[in-house]
Curated annotation (Swiss-Prot):
Residues 628-696 form the S1 motif domain. It is an enzyme of class 2 (transferase). Involved in mRNA degradation. Catalyzes the phosphorolysis of single-stranded polyribonucleotides processively in the 3'- to 5'-direction. Its cofactor is Mg(2+). The lineage of its organism: Bacteria, Pseudomonadati, Pseudomonadota, Betaproteobacteria, Burkholderiales. This is Polyribonucleotide nucleotidyltransferase.
């Protein structure tokens, strides 16, 4: 009944098993991937034909985590998995990026890849298994695909590269890098690092690519024994006559449009050129009694012609679209303290790309609690990236963040994390929001620069400045050009785009997307060296605006955090019965108070005086009464044989009638009344914490001469 095929291979410290032919047999391709106890099911369905009139490739990738994989039931009323988490969205993008360039040009059949996480070992992240599964499922499906693709995670621990480190190992690693590629080329890199050099980063990419050959070989074996017959597909023949006519009418117009340096003016000229070419082609067709050519087909030809023009100009050493050479960064302007009531803000403008970044400080209570499949954790640093349609002069949908926005936000966050102060040095939680107000390339890297400046403006003691830059690469044959600080148009027309962020000491985040298979290690080396040059220039501009070590003052509107350590046994005294004491404290002082199990008390208050008052009262509540010390006490209650006196909040003692005065006291009420302030000395305390107090001992110690005379 089943034609099950299984392949097992060693991959670093783990054993990987690929299975096909038993589960999801009606899909075009389905592979079950197991790495130790982490199991994912990857399925591919490809439609047999493209939709008529469709002019784009409809590929969708959905990575879905099931809570049963971790032996849990989902929360909420419906007890079902809800909308995709940030982790699911980011992993879907991670899978999509290396496989998309491997489908042939002109293949427009809809392809849907769905990966379900069926079982998870908390030590093994399912993302690498999911990438391997997607590649294997595409390969066994027999559809046109220039794979298979391998994937690897690389760590860097004690100066050594580690293949597919576990979660525990990653906690000690200076690098978390995911690389994907074919047998002959790297296609995608996504990484976070602790200020590592270009050489170490490139070494990790090469190491990962060498190791993933084991994955590619195993997929080849799986296809040989369990793959479906290859689908016979060939691209539609190119309409050479139409290509020639479009070039005849459009080339001069496009070259003229690309002489315009301003983005909006250039876009307008290109739209006008497109319209004119379509009108001229329609008129030409009408003159011979033929139908006008399809505008979508003409649009695709014009796009290819644009790419050819821009690429050839750059490779021949001519100025780029906006007049720069290949190494120049666009003009940068920086302004901090832009918004009056926010905790920190910065406006970072680079050419026609602009980010307004806002920093907000909070307490531990504001940390994001994430109920992840691999275990719950809290995150004290959040970065949210928003790009509204007006940033590109367009209209569009406004609402929940799209995959691109989530991906860009995570990249910017990765870049900044390494330079944040340690929690013990700065106990605030931090939220950064990057509002992209203009966009013409590299908005995620503008978010890194603006984010660093906004954090400094908010008073966050950053270890150093962090800057990011987006790079491009164009290659034809043996000729190639690396472009510094790419524009949006150059991003679309290039063969590789990569983003590098870091400090003066090293790289903190690297993201690469490569569309062709001829990018060598040497080319990447040149590109990374040029990126460092650009990054150092931007760091210099940031240094001029906000010199290193000059952290801004905390905003008047930001909470002040006061941290004190108390004896854990005294926590109950601060909280009180049913929380009565701490509730009264927070209401009366207007502060927010958090207490850890270890006795660390964090007081948050916008009003510094209120914070100090809360601190004083907590210290009173938790202070221990010292025998032999004199206290200012309050008479709480009169008794026949003395009085109950409170020496501290919650600390009462007995003032015996014999200890009130040196002479004989017949009636306590003759000397004391309730509410009266008295000076008392603590004579002793018993094992139950009960205090014995004396007024006459206090008088004798503080006024020895009158006391002696009285005697």
């Amino acid at each position: 009944m089943f034609n099950k095929v299984t392949k097992t291979f060693q991959y670093g410290q783990h054993q990987v098993t690929l299975e096909t032919g038993e589960i999801a047999r009606q899909a075009s391709g389905a592979v079950l991937v197991s790495i130790e106890d982490t199991v994912v099911l990857a399925t591919v369905v490809a439609k047999k034909d493209a939709k008529p009139g469709q002019d784009f490739f409809p590929l969708t990738v959905d990575y879905v985590e099931k809570t049963y994989a971790a032996g849990r039931i989902p929360g909420g009323f419906f007890k079902r998995e809800g909308r995709p988490s940030e982790k699911e969205t980011l992993t879907s993008r991670l899978i999509d990026r290396p496989i998309r360039p491997l489908f042939p040009e002109g293949y427009l059949n809809e392809v849907q890849i769905i990966i379900h996480v069926m079982s998870v070992n908390p030590e093994i992240d399912p993302d690498i298994a999911a990438m391997i599964g997607a590649s294997a499922a595409l390969s066994v499906a027999g559809i046109p695909f220039a794979g298979p693709v391998g994937a690897a995670r690389v760590g860097y621990i004690d100066g050594q590269y580690v293949l597919n480190p576990t979660t525990s190992q990653l906690a000690k690693s200076d690098l978390d890098l995911v690389v994907a590629g074919t047998e002959i080329a790297v296609l995608m890199v996504e990484s976070e690092a602790k200020q590592l050099s270009e050489e170490v980063m490139l070494g990790a990419v090469v190491f990962g690519h060498e190791q993933m050959k084991a994955v590619i070989d195993a997929i080849h074996d799986l296809v040989r024994d369990g793959g479906k017959p290859e689908v016979q597909w060939s691209p539609a023949p190119k309409n050479e006559a139409l290509i020639s006519r479009v070039a005849h009418f459009a080339e001069a117009k496009l070259r003229a449009a690309y002489q315009t340096k301003d983005k909006q003016a250039r876009t307008t000229k290109l739209k006008d050129a497109f319209a004119e070419v379509n009108n001229e082609l329609a008129a030409e067709a009408a003159s011979i009694g033929a139908a006008a050519p399809d505008t979508a087909e003409v649009g695709n030809i014009l796009f290819d012609l644009e790419a050819k023009i821009v690429r050839s100009q750059i490779l021949e050493g001519e100025p780029r679209i906006d007049g720069r050479d290949t190494r120049t960064v666009r003009p940068i302007t920086i302004r901090t303290g832009v918004l009056p009531r926010t905790h920190g803000s910065a406006l970072f403008t680079r050419g026609e790309t602009q980010a307004l970044v806002i920093a907000t400080l909070g307490t531990a209570r504001d940390e994001q609690k994430i109920d992840a499949l691999m275990g719950e954790y809290s995150d004290r640093f959040m970065l949210h990236y928003n790009m509204p349609p007006f940033a590109t002069g367009e209209t569009g949908r406004v609402g929940t963040p799209k995959r691109r926005e989530i991906g860009h936000g995570r990249l910017a966050k990765r870049a900044l994390v390494a330079a944040l102060p340690a929690p013990e040095d700065f106990s605030y939680s931090v939220r950064l929001v990057s509002e992209i107000t203009e966009s013409n390339g590299s908005s995620s890297m503008a978010s890194v620069c603006g984010g660093c400046l906004a954090l400094m403006d908010a008073g966050v003691p950053m270890q150093s400045h962090v800057a990011g830059i987006a790079m491009g690469l164009i290659k034809e044959g043996s000729k190639f050009a690396v472009l510094t600080d790419i524009l949006g148009d150059e991003d679309h027309l290039g063969d590789m785009d990569f983003k590098v962020a870091g400090t003066a000491n090293g790289i903190t985040a690297l993201q690469m997307d490569i569309k062709i298979q001829g990018i060598t290690k040497e080319i990447m080396q040149v590109a990374l060296a040029q990126a460092k040059e650009g990054r150092v220039h931007i760091l210099g501009e940031m240094e001029k605006a906000v010199p290193s070590g000059t952290t801004g003052e905390l905003s008047d509107f930001a909470p002040r955090l006061i941290t004190i350590k108390i004896n854990p046994e005294k926590i109950r005294d601060v909280i009180g019965k049913g929380g009565a004491v701490i509730r009264a404290l927070t209401e009366e002082t207007g502060t927010q108070i958090d207490i850890s199990d270890e006795g660390v008390v964090t007081i948050a208050s916008v009003d510094a005086a209120a914070g100090q008052e809360a601190k004083r009262r907590i210290e009173e509540l938790t202070a221990s009464v010292e025998v032999g010390k004199i206290y200012e006490g309050t008479v709480l209650k009169l008794l026949d044989f003395g009085a109950i006196v409170q020496v501290m909040p919650g600390k009462d003692g007995l003032l015996h009638i014999s200890q009130i005065a040196n002479e004989r006291v017949n009636a306590v009420a003759d000397y004391l009344q309730e509410g009266q302030q008295v000076r008392v000395k603590v004579l002793e305390t018993d094992d139950r914490g009960r205090l014995k107090l004396s007024m006459k001992a206090a008088v004798a110690e503080e006024n020895p001469e009158p006391a002696a005379a009285q005697e």
